[in-house]
Regions:
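Short, acidic (Asp/Glu-rich) active-site segment that either coordinates a divalent metal cofactor
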Residues: 80-83, 90-94, 141, 203-211, ...
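Generic non-transmembrane alpha-helical segments
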Residues: 9-21, 58-66, 124, 237-248, ...
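N-terminal flexible segment immediately upstream of the FAD-binding catalytic core
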Residues: 1-61, 65, 78-108, 257-270, ...
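C-terminal substrate-recognition/cap domain of FAD-linked oxidoreductases
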Residues: 26-33, 216, 225-229, 234-332
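Glycine-rich beta-strand-to-loop/alpha-helix junction loops that act as flexible
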Residues: 73-77
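Short hydrophobic alpha-helical runs that function as membrane-insertion/retention elements
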Residues: 71-72, 132
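Feature of Fe-S/electron-transfer and energy-metabolism proteins
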Residues: 1-5, 28-34, 42, 48-54, ...
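FAD-binding subdomain of flavoenzyme oxidoreductases
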Residues: 99-106, 110-253
Length: 332
C-alpha cells in the first residue's frame, strides 16, 4: 500500500497523544528516511516518537483507522532497508521506549523497552550479558533485534534473538496490546508470542518491550584470526572442526581478502597478518584451556592471537567493520 499525506486533523490528533515535539514532519524527518549505509532512502509524511506502550497503541489505532501504512523503526542500524519508509509510510520510531527493569537474580532475566540498546541491556548486570552480540550494539535496539531475529557474533553459542526471549509486549495494528512478559521458560498456555514475533519484521505487531534471558559473561575469552590459504573451503572445514573440538567456542566468523582490502583502503585498518590470504576465520573461545584448544585446531597456519580486551577488539574490528565496506562502495 503506497504512502500518502497525513491529513492535518490527524496530525493534530497524533500530536495530542505524543506532544507536538514528537510528531516530526518536513526536514526534521531526514535522519529517519535512510539506512545506515545510505544505500536505501525513502520519504515519509511524518515520524512519530512515542515514549510509552499506551502511546504506541493510540497512534496505531489512529493510523489504522485512517488506512495509513506504518514502518516501525528501532536504532535504524539495519543494512537492508527494513526500517526505511521506501513507499512513503509513516515512521514509528521506538527509540524513546527506554525503560530497563532490574535484573531478576533468580532467573537471570531482565525486561527492556524496545528502545533500549543491546549495549545498555548487556550492562544491566556485571556478571551477565546479552547472548546476541552485534557490531552496532551501542545503537541497535532490543525491539529491532527482536523484529529481525538478530543473530550476531555469538549465535553459535547462544542462538539468535529468538533464543534469548522469555516474553514480549507488543501492539497490533489496531492498537490492541499483547501482554506476555511473565518470563516462564516452559509456558504452554497459548501461542508462543515471543517466537512468533521474533523475525516478523513488524508485519504482525510492533514490539514495545521484551523479557530477555541473560547469559553468564564469558570468562577469559581468547580471540584468534587465522589465515585460510585454500579459501572458503578451508574456512568451512576449520569452523566445523571448531564446533566439534573447542568446548568453549563462542564465535566463528569469516571474512575474505576483497572485503578486507576495502576496509584497509578506506577505514584506516592495517593488514592483520604479514601476508594476505584468500579468506580468514575469526574464532573466539572462553574458559579453561581455550587457548590450548584453539592452538590444537589451528596447527601451523598463520594466526594472530589476542587475549587482552583491547587486542581482541582490534581483531574483531576486521569483522565488525565489514558492513562499512558496503557503504564505501556506494549505492548498488
Amino acid at each position: 500500500m503506497a504512502g500518502s499525506a497525513v491529513p492535518p486533523a490527524l496530525l493534530r490528533d497524533l500530536a495530542a497523544v505524543l506532544g507536538g515535539n514528537h510528531v516530526l514532519t518536513g526536514d526534521a524527518t531526514a535522519g529517519y528516511v535512510t539506512d545506515w549505509t545510505s544505500r536505501y532512502r525513502g520519504t515519509t509524511p511524518a515520524v512519530l516518537r512515542p515514549e510509552r506502550t499506551e502511546q504506541v497503541a493510540a497512534v496505531l489505532a489512529l493510523l489504522s483507522g485512517a488506512g495509513i501504512p506504518v514502518v516501525p523503526q528501532g536504532g535504524n542500524t539495519g543494512l537492508v532497508g527494513g526500517g526505511v519508509p521506501l513507499h512513503g509510510e509513516v515512521v514509528l520510531s521506538l527509540a524513546r521506549l527506554t525503560g530497563l527493569g532490574p535484573v531478576d537474580q533468580d532467573s537471570g532475566q531482565v525486561t527492556a523497552g524496545a528502545g533500549v540498546t543491546l549495549a545498555a541491556a548487556a550492562a544491566a548486570d556485571p556478571g551477565l550479558d546479552v547472548g546476541v552480540l552485534i557490531a552496532s550494539r551501542d545503537s541497535a535496539t532490543v525491539g529491532g533485534a527482536v523484529a529481525t531475529n538478530a543473530g550476531g557474533l555469538r549465535v553459535l553459542r547462544y542462538g539468535p534473538m529468538r533464543a534469548q526471549l522469555r516474553g514480549v509486549q507488543a501492539v497490533l495494528s489496531d492498537g490492541t496490546v499483547i501482554e506476555h512478559l511473565g518470563g516462564l521458560v516452559k509456558d504452554n498456555t497459548g501461542y508462543d508470542y515471543p517466537s512468533l514475533l521474533a523475525g516478523s519484521e513488524g508485519t504482525l505487531a510492533v514490539v514495545t518491550a521484551a523479557r530477555l534471558q541473560l547469559v553468564p559473561r564469558p570468562r577469559d575469552p581468547v580471540t584468534v584470526l587465522v589465515a585460510a590459504g585454500d579459501g572458503l573451503e578451508e574456512v568451512h572445514g576449520l569452523a566445523r572442526s571448531a564446533v566439534r573440538t573447542v568446548p568453549g567456542l563462542l564465535s566463528a566468523e569469516f571474512l575474505t581478502q576483497p572485503g578486507l582490502d576495502v576496509l584497509i583502503a578506506h577505514a584506516g585498518l592495517v593488514p592483520p597478518l604479514p601476508a594476505p590470504a584468500p579468506a580468514y576465520l575469526i574464532l573466539e573461545a572462553a574458559g579453561r584451556g581455550a587457548l590450548d584448544d584453539l592452538a590444537g585446531l589451528i596447527g601451523d597456519r598463520p594466526v594472530a592471537v589476542a587475549e587482552a580486551a583491547a587486542d581482541r577488539a582490534r581483531l574483531w574490528a576486521y569483522r565488525e567493520r565489514m558492513p562499512e565496506a558496503a557503504g564505501f562502495l556506494g549505492p548498488p
